[in-house]
């Protein structure tokens, strides 16, 4: 069984290129080899990268017992744990998904809206007029507070909240290092590496999460609480079985890490462009302040930011048996990783003319296509928290736009380069801005979002 052709450089070179400069590496490979090519990242199985939407549809709608996303995500196991919804396959994954999905839809989301606004307003109140703000860091503080409150219902001034926030910050700082992804891959494949550098932070986070679980299981008011942990503790499958402490720990860690890092990054990339395109910023502010009729500009900004700079460059499926992607290639061997590339699909010129241009108007009156806009993955593996993330981005961006006037810290910079934080593509300098002015929250409550 032959693999599609791909770069001929050594696996060490390809691994380094993927780690340090993933988008250029993917783009140059597509230019040379087309929409399907094989890369060798050394410490994982061969990776067949796919950037044709029709083939991506075939991957996302294929037999999940053959195209195993959990096995394809094993690089995440050292942090998220083996019972994370991202690491499970087959019936175990479907069971977990059914238990978790209801917590992130419908009336549950409406209940989080005011929480998101309140936390964002408190953060803005702490920003100093005339001072430089790294918006990546500022948004991270906001999204971390939101997810902590949503998951645990914690008082933001409590000792346990502070400890959990500090432990997560230590993990994030480690993930900012250039070797974090390689370290995670080596640990996931049981190879020696530098895992000892981050393990104490993970252990500290685990102790706090397990303490929350134990405390909440015994809470007399459990049935009255509306935080996600309490709701998950009460959730049962069709056999009347709930989630174990280990399952809860892994799902909570997944929501903590995935629930704020990618959202933070998408908003930082949105502002990286908005600060350089004043007309687009003014339109967002006018909509947020209720000065213009809501035509969906905020959502268009979010869709375009996540298209142009998707936080995750590709997703993965591991083949449990030989499987045919393209007839001309024949079946791919079992163990091969098939990887739809979000980055490459989002930068196809035949789908998105001038793909590097930031043009939110692409999305006005347009619903994103399932296989051409996929920052949340697709198929039965689409992110369970996608609705939460989109609501959070909408509320945070509108609140910030309604209350603040921000300008670039370095007006001479035309764009910000990409850096890597574990598996996430972030603005290299954190989207540096100066706060020129700030309106009081009472005078600038963001306009209601159209349903």
What function would you assign to each model-found segment?
Residues 220-226, 283-296, 308-329, 345, ...:
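Cytochrome P450 fold signature focused on the C-terminal beta-domain
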Residues 30-31, 120, 166-170, 289-293, ...:
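Cytochrome P450 proximal C-terminal region
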Residues 15-34, 207, 292-328, 349:
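Conserved cytochrome P450 K-helix E-x-x-R motif and the immediately C-terminal K′/meander segment
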Residues 262-281, 285-287, 387-404:
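Cytochrome P450 catalytic-core helices
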């Amino acid at each position: 069984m032959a693999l599609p052709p791909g770069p001929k450089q050594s696996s060490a070179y390809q691994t380094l290129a993927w780690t340090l400069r993933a988008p250029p590496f993917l783009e140059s490979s597509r230019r040379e080899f087309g929409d399907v090519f094989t890369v060798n990242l050394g410490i994982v199985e061969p990776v067949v990268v796919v950037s044709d939407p029709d083939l991506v549809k075939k991957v996302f709608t294929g037999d999940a017992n053959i195209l195993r996303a959990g096995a394809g995500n094993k690089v995440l196991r050292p942090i998220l744990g083996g019972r994370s919804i991202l690491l499970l396959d087959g019936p175990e994954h479907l069971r977990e998904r059914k238990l978790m999905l209801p917590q992130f839809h419908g009336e549950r989301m409406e209940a989080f809206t005011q929480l998101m606004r309140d936390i964002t307003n408190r953060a803005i109140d702490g920003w100093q007029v005339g001072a430089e703000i790294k918006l990546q860091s500022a948004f991270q503080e906001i999204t971390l507070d939101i997810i902590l409150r949503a998951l645990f219902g914690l008082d933001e001034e409590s000792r346990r909240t502070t400890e959990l926030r500090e432990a997560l910050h230590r993990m994030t700082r480690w993930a900012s290092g250039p070797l974090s992804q390689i370290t995670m891959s080596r640990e996931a494949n049981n190879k020696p590496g530098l895992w000892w550098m981050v393990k104490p932070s993970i252990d500290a986070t685990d102790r706090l999460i397990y303490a929350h679980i134990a405390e909440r299981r015994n809470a007399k008011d459990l049935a009255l609480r509306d935080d996600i942990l309490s709701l998950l503790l009460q959730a049962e499958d069709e056999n009347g079985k709930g989630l174990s402490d280990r399952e809860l720990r892994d799902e909570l860690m997944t929501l903590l890490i995935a629930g704020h890092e990618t959202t933070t990054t998408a908003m930082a990339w949105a502002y990286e462009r908005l600060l350089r395109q004043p007309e687009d910023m003014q339109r967002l502010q006018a909509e947020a302040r209720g000065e213009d009729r809501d035509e969906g500009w905020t959502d268009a900004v979010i869709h375009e930011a996540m298209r142009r700079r998707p936080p995750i460059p590709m997703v993965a499926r591991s083949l449990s048996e030989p499987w045919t992607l393209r007839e001309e290639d024949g079946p791919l061997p079992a163990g091969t990783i098939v990887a739809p590339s979000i980055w490459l699909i989002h930068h196809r010129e035949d789908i998105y003319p001038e793909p590097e241009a930031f043009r939110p108007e692409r999305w006005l009156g347009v619903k994103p296509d399932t296989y051409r806009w996929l920052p949340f993955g697709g198929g039965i593996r689409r992110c369970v928290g996608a609705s939460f993330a989109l609501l959070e981005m909408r509320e945070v961006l509108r609140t910030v736009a309604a209350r603040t006037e921000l300008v670039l810290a370095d007006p001479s910079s035309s764009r910000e380069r990409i850096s890597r934080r574990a598996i996430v593509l972030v603005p290299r300098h954190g989207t540096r801005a100066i706060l020129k002015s700030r309106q009081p929250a009472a005078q600038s409550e963001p306009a209601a979002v159209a349903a």
